[in-house]
């Protein structure tokens, strides 16, 4: 697992990006967010996640809010 901070997240479109210190930003889709109910992230929120190879490159998986 890796830690990062939410750079931005668009609730209407259901995706955004996570900043990783010393690395490239990682795409995140709402389906990758762990937990029940409405799945959303807030700008600046700390998260833990795994990186997997998606159709268009690296993306976050198993995203957990810290």
From Swiss-Prot:
- GO molecular function of the protein, one example? nucleic acid binding
Q: Name one GO cellular component term.
A: cytoplasm
Result of knocking out the encoding gene: A double cshB-cspD mutant grows slowly at 15 degrees Celsius.
Q: Which InterPro entries match?
A: Cold_shock_CspA, Cold_shock_domain, CSD, CSD_CS, CSP_DNA-bd, NA-bd_OB-fold
- Where in or outside the cell is it found? Cytoplasm
Listed SUPFAM superfamilies: Nucleic acid-binding proteins
The gene for this chain is cspD
Which keywords annotate this record? Activator, Cytoplasm, DNA-binding, Stress response, Transcription, Transcription regulation
Q: Which residues form the CSD domain?
A: 4-63
Lineage at the top is: Bacteria, Bacillati, Bacillota, Bacilli, Bacillales
Its main subcellular localisation, reduced to a broad class, is: cytoplasm
Q: What is this protein called?
A: Cold shock protein CspD
What induces the gene encoding this protein? In response to low temperature.
Q: Name one GO biological process term.
A: regulation of gene expression
Please tell me whether the keyword Cytoplasm is annotated for this protein: yes
Spell out the PROSITE patterns in the cross-references.
Answer: CSD_1, CSD_2
């Amino acid at each position: 697992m890796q830690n990062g901070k939410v750079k931005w997240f668009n609730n209407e479109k259901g995706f955004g990006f996570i900043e990783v210190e010393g690395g490239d930003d990682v795409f995140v889709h709402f389906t990758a967010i762990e937990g029940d109910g409405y799945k959303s992230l807030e700008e600046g929120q700390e998260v833990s996640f795994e990186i997997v190879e998606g159709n268009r490159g690296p993306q976050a998986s198993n995203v957990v809010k810290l």
